[in-house]
Amino acid sequence: MKLCLLALGAAVAAAPTATLANGDTITGLNAIVNEKFLGIPFAEPPVGTLRFKPPVPYSASLNGQQFTSYGPSCMQMNPMGSFEDTLPKNARHLVLQSKIFQVVLPNDEDCLTINVIRPPGTRASAGLPVMLWIFGGGFELGGSSLFPGDQMVAKSVLMGKPVIHVSMNYRVASWGFLAGPDIQNEGSGNAGLHDQRLAMQWVADNIAGFGGDPSKVTIYGESAGSMSTFVHLVWNDGDNTYNGKPLFRAAIMQSGCMVPSDPVDGTYGTEIYNQVVASAGCGSASDKLACLRGLSQDTLYQATSDTPGVLAYPSLRLSYLPRPDGTFITDDMYALVRDGKYAHVPVIIGDQNDEGTLFGLSSLNVTTDAQARAYFKQSFIHASDAEIDTLMAAYTSDITQGSPFDTGIFNAITPQFKRISALLGDLAFTLARRYFLNYYQGGTKYSFLSKQLSGLPVLGTFHGNDIIWQDYLVGSGSVIYNNAFIAFANDLDPNKAGLWTNWPTYTSSSQSGNNLMQINGLGLYTGKDNFRPDAYSALFSNPPSFFV
């Protein structure tokens, strides 16, 4: 009996292994509740002459190596600046502790690694569905270690619908999304997206050796990760194949879809490039890109952090973000979805009810109608005076109509805060989702809207709170962000999770029936996606007017 117990203990404690497509066998970590392979390199270090360029697949042998801890996150920038000092005291702690706005340490330029978490005892022949996560962070910060996926895998086992969870690091800020004519002419735009795409190709090549099915991959992400997920739908005008097979069969987008951005060589991207060049001391160099590539990691970090962060004024006018490059992103993203140039896969897309409140906090100096108009003019340089007038009429200074929504006269910490918060949330997230759904005809569509924190002062159901329920807590939100997503990855139908409220498919925002799953602190219910029609018309009658 003792020998049997010893043998059983040894079997339980045995380190898991996986064999890659090239025949290399690697070892992971037995965490009892799951098995982890962490920090596997999928690309050559993007340093030196490879800085800012699309990634090069990793070529060295990994045979016999152990992968038991996360690799360093990619280099990031400070998203706050002096923003922390302007936060109201009752919102400061929540914002600063929000996972989406934390710089993930340690970080390094040699960072392009991938992680695989699978249920315990998974055999190579298991053929499990795969959930491939893309983290958020405003394209300026973040890392795969912050959103580990452990809860997703554990919950999938309890549901009897086991999945393998994959996450990757990708370059952010200037390292991944530097723009400008020099970058465009070299063909190096959107390097961070190329990192993500190469990681997807790594999954296609290797996930079968871990027990995953490469034909059952669901890509998903939150915030910048959600926008990235959308971009992969329209990448190459919707051709998502690799070696003749689709890289993914479904997509989930949590807060984000089309990116309202000018091309790589557009005005604002070029302005940011010039700021980095000047701050780095490369302004007089004959080859400015070569000069930037010759900088130390710390010097480039300082120059990058001198540019406006995601929470700087004017908020959400991001310094670094995906931009049309004419090759992989062939047009503006609204045009691509309108023209049907996307991969045809089932999708889930949803938002938090008060997506804009976090970002509205950076504009507390705007207190009058005149200042609000000037703020909109500064933020949207392509918009005509008439379009700004229409925007001002759609988003009035009536505090009962602003965000946090449905809070009446409360939470108006300045006369313009709720107005600006409503507009920012709708443009980047909530009503952009409606635009996507109205045009996307690529497969079955499901949509959600969370009001789970509607009573939270100042912030309401703020951007990024879904990650708390998805990775760390249990509640009605986690029923969607875990159970329903797991069912979708397995069966392409979130209702297979046994939800107590049937999740209707989405046809159009003008349909007569309920088409939106809504989440609150008490549970799940359905509703109509027909709110704020005047705001929708003001923002999306001519989307390029509001590009950055």
Curated annotation (Swiss-Prot):
BP GO terms, sorted: lipid catabolic process
Disulfide bonding pattern of the chain: C74-C111, C282-C291
Residues in the signal sequence: 1-14
EC number: 3.1.1.3
Active site: S223 (acyl-ester intermediate), E355 (charge relay system), H463 (charge relay system)
Pfam families on file: COesterase
InterPro entries: AB_hydrolase_fold, CarbesteraseB, Carboxylesterase_B_AS, Carboxylesterase_B_CS, Type-B_Carboxylest/Lipase
Substrates-to-products reaction catalysed: a triacylglycerol + H2O = a diacylglycerol + a fatty acid + H(+)
Top-level taxonomic group: Eukaryota
GO molecular function, one term: triacylglycerol lipase activity
Residue positions with a glycan: N365
Cross-referenced Gene3D superfamilies: alpha/beta hydrolase (3.40.50.1820)
UniProt keywords, alphabetically: Disulfide bond, Glycoprotein, Hydrolase, Lipid degradation, Lipid metabolism, Signal
Family classification: Belongs to the type-B carboxylesterase/lipase family.
The name this protein goes by in its record: Lipase 2
The organism of origin for this protein: Diutina rugosa (Yeast)
Lineage: Eukaryota, Fungi, Dikarya, Ascomycota, Saccharomycotina
Name of the gene this protein is made from: LIP2
